[in-house]
Amino acid sequence: MATVDRWLLPDGIEEVLPPEAARIEVARRQVLDLFQSWGYEFVVTPHIEYLESLLTGAGQDLDLRTFKVIDPQSGRQMGFRADITPQVARIDAHTLRREGPSRLCYAGSVLHAQPRALSSSRSPIQLGAELYGDASPSSDVEVISLMLAMLQLADVPDVHMDLGHVGIYRGLAQAAGLSGEVEQQLFDALQRKAIDEVITLTEGLPADLSGMLRALVDLCGGREVLSAARERLANAPAPVLAALEDLLAIAERLSVRFPELPLYFDLGELRGYHYHTGVVFAVFVPGVGQSIAQGGRYDDIGADFGRARPATGFSTDLKTLVTLGRAEIELPSGGIWMPDSTDAALWQQVCQLRSEGQRVVQALPGQPLAAARDADCDRQLIQQNGLWQVSPLAS
């Protein structure tokens, strides 16, 4: 490797330098404090695990995004975490094994073999919260509200939210007896709003089911979509109607809590279809081509770890949150310059100052006083009448 290439980083892998790294860390603490104030407990998951554990309950998309290695000790295949959510689900289902509702949150770096989108980072700092043990819409409203509170804390402007429910399509597909390749083809066509393909794929179905599946292409827009869905899906199976009622209940409560929030409904939006089981949601802002925070309900994942538990949650990339947010993140500025000295009294004074939260930078041999400014110091320790005192740094 040429010397010049030794400093190159892989595509999508970034360094974070001062002071941006400090801003991200301050934001991380603020968001985790917010989560804690809502009753969410912080957990730390491993960076690397055996692959069968890491990908349990996850879809093919997560498999493709996971860096894989061989453990030299066991010879087993391992993966670097690409999504912390399944790890937290395992903690709830297998490790904690609580009976009642459990609220957990996390923040940590993940690695993606493939980026989510062009120009996306492959090393985001994933941050999120999960609520386990309750299947009601109240839990979905809680995690969505927490996600929006997080965005308000960061002062992210012009937030818009998309809402959908995979149970609507899943219930119709099951009632129609769709499975395998046909269901996947219909799923793909719905994501592209390819109405001609949807019509072709549903031609052999009973008229009422084909009509309702085709209606999913058009059922997207504002609150009026929910009223239209009640009419056009009136003859749908009970699970579909229950899913629609859940979505209506969630939308009503969000409108009360966040009356200024633009809501967009898309009943054909099947983001995370093979992973989620209920409501799905995502937040978008103008000028960004992908969601900046997203989540949904995924009640089945705990079964893969020995105990099925209702679950709902969301995640975001902390670096994106800091970049888009307008909130002022105050960083400590200034400091105290201390001379290079063996004086025990000076050392005691410095220890006291640091314990009080003061930033004290020691001069190294040969450094002139002018170096204090380069170290962002605005004061200095000087000895007066045998005592070390803090005084302003001469300009």
UniProtKB/Swiss-Prot annotation:
Domain of life per record: Bacteria
GO biological process: L-histidine biosynthetic process
Pathway: Amino-acid biosynthesis; L-histidine biosynthesis; L-histidine from 5-phospho-alpha-D-ribose 1-diphosphate: step 1/9
Keyword Repeat: no
Keywords carried by this UniProt record: Amino-acid biosynthesis, Cytoplasm, Histidine biosynthesis
Keyword Cytoplasm: yes
Signal peptide range: none
First-listed, main subcellular location of the protein, grouped into a coarse class: cytoplasm
Annotated compartments: Cytoplasm
Cellular component annotations (GO), alphabetically ordered: cytoplasm
Classification via Pfam families: tRNA-synt_His (PF13393)
NCBIfam families: hisZ_biosyn_reg (TIGR00443), PRK12292.1-1 (NF008935), PRK12292.1-4 (NF008937), PRK12421.1 (NF009086)
Subunit (UniProt): Heteromultimer composed of HisG and HisZ subunits.
Function summary: Required for the first step of histidine biosynthesis. May allow the feedback regulation of ATP phosphoribosyltransferase activity by histidine.
Family, similarity comment: Belongs to the class-II aminoacyl-tRNA synthetase family. HisZ subfamily.
Further comment found in the protein's record: This function is generally fulfilled by the C-terminal part of HisG, which is missing in some bacteria such as this one.
Protein name: ATP phosphoribosyltransferase regulatory subunit
Species the sequence originates in: Pseudomonas fluorescens (strain Pf0-1)
Gene it is expressed from: hisZ
